[in-house]
Regions:
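Conserved phosphate-binding catalytic cores of ATP/NTP-utilizing and phosphoryl-transfer enzymes
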Residues: 1-2, 106-134
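Gly/Thr-rich phosphate-binding beta-strand-loop-beta motif of the actin/hexokinase/Hsp70
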Residues: 2-24, 132-148
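Short glycine-rich, Thr/Ser-proximal phosphate-binding strand/loop in the N-terminal lobe
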Residues: 10-49, 154, 204-209
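Short beta-strand-loop/turn "lid" adjacent to the catalytic site in phosphate-handling enzymes
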Residues: 60-97
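Glycine-rich beta-strand-to-loop/alpha-helix junction loops that act as flexible
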Residues: 75-78, 100, 139, 343-351
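Glycine-rich phosphate-binding/hydrolytic loop that grips phosphoryl groups
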Residues: 117-120, 372-386
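Glycine-rich phosphate-binding loop plus the immediately following alpha-helix
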Residues: 150-162, 198-251, 298-300
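A contiguous, well-structured pocket-lining segment that forms one wall/lid of small-molecule binding clefts
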Residues: 241-342, 351-367
Length: 386
């Protein structure tokens, strides 16, 4: 049986995973990078340093859980599967992967972080038999609707030698021209032709961007709002819980059972005070800087802090506007492509609030939304290993 070690080093997490040839997850380890209170992310140099610290520790932990033979090592080389896509954080994982592969005398292969996100959901979904499909990548720095096609590598399956001992491992350093990018690859209007810059790198998918953001991402809006409220970065998960709780109170017969001492009138007043303007979507494209400005102006104007009722109301409306905008974007791209199903990946797509509301919105338009496992939507090394 062949076992593959996967390594991913994003702007948010250090991740290591082991899978077998039947796609069973043997080991899945992740560690958030530490961000100082009040800051909205890390500089690349700081993130790179933390990855260098985390990787040996996670490798030791992996070996305590799995002592079998590793037959190949896979890693993320770059944010997106295209020439010019580059971020220093991925040098930590690719360098560590090459060293580990050389030490174990096994092959090493690299993909893009975005391909890892896609494969982590696709491999365990109905899309695993589709060679072309519509997908969304919603994460901390990416907001894209993609027309995805398999390359010959995916159609033919992984080369047999990935599961055989080799005479050595490739040790050439990855290189690519730097581009101005948000966390893990900002949106661009057109996909460039995939062009691996490293002999160990492979391209599993070609991705053409058919919709998305023209400025910032959903993840950035959520994180900036959360940090402005005094939350730790990344803040999307905490805001998601708050949004769900407010909706639960709205649906409860007595809101006071959810928020002690709160009446329905108080709930409605909080909702009205924090109401945000909907995001306009045209031809599958949108701008999110306005939503970001609105949310933070509400925080300043109302003097909001964590745990206040109005803060929960703001979280709920922010997620509601995000859900509607994302759904509208998908609907427009679906109409243009003629595809009635969409795969959703990325950390933002792990939100329970978004999953519930978007399924309802999209199903009403005859579109099937495939989200997959919540944990596999977030940054992970499983997709890279697959």
């Amino acid at each position: 049986m062949g076992y593959i070690l996967g390594i991913d080093t994003s702007n948010y997490k250090t991740s290591i995973a082991v899978i077998d040839h039947k796609k069973h997850i043997i080991c899945d380890l992740r560690r958030f990078l530490t961000v100082k209170q009040g800051e909205r992310g890390l500089r690349q140099s700081d993130a790179l340093f933390q990855h260098i610290q985390n990787l040996p520790e996670l490798m030791e932990e992996m070996r305590r859980m799995f002592d079998g033979r590793i037959d190949a090592v896979a890693c993320s080389f770059r944010p997106r599967p295209e020439a010019g896509s580059y971020m220093p954080v991925f040098l930590a994982g690719s360098g560590f992967a090459k060293a580990a592969a050389a030490a174990m005398n096994v092959p090493v292969v690299g993909f893009s972080h975005q391909e890892g996100h896609m494969e982590a959901i696709r491999a365990y979904s109905p899309f695993q038999t589709e060679d072309r499909f519509l997908a969304c990548h919603f994460s901390g720095g990416t907001c894209e609707v993609l027309d995805v096609s398999e390359t010959d590598l995916r159609k033919d399956g992984m080369p047999k030698q990935y599961f055989e001992r080799s005479s050595g491992a490739d040790d050439n350093g990855a290189s690519a021209k730097k581009q101005g990018a948000d966390n893990n690859g900002a949106s661009a209007k057109k996909a460039k032709k995939p062009h691996p810059a490293d002999p160990a790198e492979r391209v599993a998918y070609t991705m053409h961007i058919t919709g998305g953001t023209k400025d910032i991402s959903f993840g950035q809006v959520l994180d900036r709002t959360g940090v402005a409220l005094g939350m730790e970065f990344p803040a999307g998960g905490q805001l998601d819980l708050m949004a769900q709780k407010f909706c639960e109170a709205e649906q409860a017969e007595d809101p006071g059972e959810i928020f002690k001492g709160v009446s329905r009138d108080m709930l409605q007043a909080a909702k009205e005070a924090c109401r945000l303007t909907p995001v306009k979507v045209k031809d599958g494209w949108l701008n999110l800087s306005g939503l970001d400005t609105q949310a933070r102006s509400r925080i300043d104007r109302l003097g909001l802090e964590q745990k206040q009722l109005q803060t929960y109301a703001l979280a709920a409306d922010l997620f509601a506007k995000t859900s509607k905008a994302a759904s509208d974007m998908i609907i427009q791209c679906s109409e243009h492509s003629g595809r009635a199903s969409v795969l959703l990946a990325g950390g933002v797509a792990s939100s329970k609030f978004l999953r519930s509301h978007m399924r309802k919105e999209l199903n009403g338009r005859g579109i099937t939304a495939v989200f997959g496992d919540e944990m596999l939507s977030q940054d992970n090394a499983v997709g890279i290993a697959l």
